[in-house]
């Protein structure tokens, strides 16, 4: 497993404990640096994910990834773009639909239907309101 997040490296110990306590598999963390860049006050989390996914596709061309995210920020757009550019590297895209409150806390806005409407969702796309719903869909497709 690889955990790609816009979270900063300094949260690694907390993230590792959370994953362990909740039964997630061990894995590699692909986090970002926190702080300003030469041209902006904050780093682009979206660009971090795009660049890292591109690097993974280049370094591991034989692996088909299951991309898991939520609709609170840019995961649907990023994962869809990756699937279009690297279709041979994507086994499935799982998107958890956040509640209104979770979406506001995640990004300060609610966009779910507006932006997701512009994404062509193919056979790789799975959506659910929680991890159990997504897991059941993975089971139905024989991916777990």
Locations of the language-model features?
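C-terminal cap/substrate-recognition subdomain and adjoining C-terminal extension
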Residues: 7-144
